[in-house]
From Swiss-Prot:
Lineage: Bacteria, Bacillati, Bacillota, Bacilli, Lactobacillales
Cofactor: record remark: Mg(2+). Can also accept Mn(2+).
Pfam family, one: Acetate_kinase
Enzyme Commission number(s) from the entry: 2.7.2.1
Protein species of origin: Lacticaseibacillus paracasei (strain ATCC 334 / BCRC 17002 / CCUG 31169 / CIP 107868 / KCTC 3260 / NRRL B-441) (Lactobacillus paracasei)
UniProt protein name: Acetate kinase
Length: 396
């Protein structure tokens, strides 16, 4: 038996889950929050619903990892830290360099750092954390699992932008997508639920959360996805605009007197989407509560549904039909009203859901389809961390 950590690191947070493998039993999950602030927060759930919380200053990545390791031992999750034989790291951008998960050596770490332009807010932080784990747990196998890797099966007609081809060859300007680890997990799990080979299915995965994407999966491979060079593209999201005309960026910069493109991208990433349209919130639950009394709340919801439906329709056309629709992630797993609204517009595909089941299903696996539906509609809670530790086991 081996114990494997799955790590999701950000500039001010460190999220982790500890698994007993190969049994795939989750032993604990934790969060280090507000890193670098006077009162950082540590939260851990373990055992049979037990919780541990503390407020303590954690200044840097080294202290965050030391806190994680110390708490894992203090809570009796391991007797010796050497029981943890592997650590899997979520890495946002792998570019064309990485089409699958890899064991991290010094050369790999440098490659991840060199991809920082593809995800400047994420890759440098993730590379730094990998380096810290390598130094503090030198006995463990460190594995990088890339959000973009699953989408490396896309063909050029789906991943290239219609800009000068040299920009792709020289600068890597193309669609990379995101949420690949999530889509890989839920598509495989959906096939298992249906007791059918994944390779025989045409599937559309709707990963709907604060960040949302739609992915066409055919024969077990990603053939197209809504997110683009970065996760800013695609459907409307919580605070992200999704697809817009690039000329609008220059137009708004002039009108708003925004001096640099980075500031404009910040607006599109942080002040747009559901929040920007509604002027109320980026939280779907808040908008649903207000949709009958506040027109812009309803408008934001309508736009969100509209964009998802458009992508689903285009991907059904791309695959010459669809066998399975899958809802996952925070909104997809818990947003019964949003699922209902989306599915009302997909009846033409032969996809029908039983709303008695739909409105009772939250965060659990469920077949939402009616008996006469020719397209299956499934709710599959995502589990990126389990996918990550499986990759660690496979590479250890």
């Amino acid at each position: 038996m081996a114990k494997i950590l799955a790590v999701n690191a950000g500039s001010s947070t460190l999220k982790w889950k500890l698994f007993d493998m190969p049994a795939e039993v989750q032993l604990a999950e934790g969060l280090v929050d507000r890193l670098g602030q006077p009162q950082s927060k540590v939260k851990i759930k373990y055992g049979d619903g037990q919780k541990y919380e503390s407020d303590t200053p954690i200044a840097n990545y080294q202290e965050a990892v030391a806190s994680l390791m110390g708490n894992i031992k203090a809570l009796g999750l391991v007797e010796h830290l050497h029981e943890i034989t592997g650590v899997g790291h979520r890495v946002v951008a792998g570019g064309e360099t990485f089409a699958e998960s890899v064991v991290v050596d010094d050369a790999t770490l440098l490659q991840i750092q060199n991809l920082r332009d593809y995800a400047p807010l994420h890759n440098p932080v993730e590379a730094d954390y990998i380096d810290v784990f390598k130094k503090m747990m030198p006995w463990a196998t460190e594995v990088a699992v890339f959000d973009t890797a699953f989408h490396q099966t896309m063909q050029p007609e789906n991943f290239l932008y219609s800009i000068p081809y040299d920009y792709y060859k020289k600068y890597g300007a193309r669609k990379y997508g995101a949420h690949g680890t999530s889509v890989r997990y839920v598509s495989a799990r959906a096939a298992e639920m249906l007791n059918k080979p994944l390779e025989d299915l045409r599937m559309i995965v709707m990963h709907l959360g604060s960040g949302s994407s739609v992915t066409a999966v055919q024969g077990g491979q990603s053939i197209d996805t809504s997110m683009g060079f970065t996760p800013l593209a695609g459907v409307t999201m919580g605070t992200r605009s999704g697809d817009i005309d690039p000329s609008l960026v220059a137009y708004l910069m002039k009108k708003l007197d925004v001096p640099d493109v980075g500031q404009m991208i910040h607006i599109l990433n942080n002040d747009s989407g559901l929040l920007g349209i509604s002027g109320i919130s980026n939280d779907m639950r808040d908008l649903e509560a207000d949709e009958d009394t506040k027109p812009r709340a309803k408008l934001a919801l309508d736009i969100f549904v509209n964009r998802v439906v458009k992508y689903v329709g285009s991907y059904a056309a791309l695959m010459d039909g669809v066998d399975v629709l899958v809802f996952t992630a925070g909104i997809g797993e818990n947003g019964d009203e949003i699922r209902d609204k989306i599915m009302r517009s997909l009846d033409y595909l032969g996809a029908k859901i039983d709303n008695d089941i739909n409105y009772k299903s939250h965060g659990v696996e469920a077949d939402l389809s009616t008996p006469d539906s020719t397209v299956k509609t499934l709710l599959v809670p995502t589990n990126e961390e389990l996918m990550i530790v499986r990759d660690v086991m496979a590479l250890s």
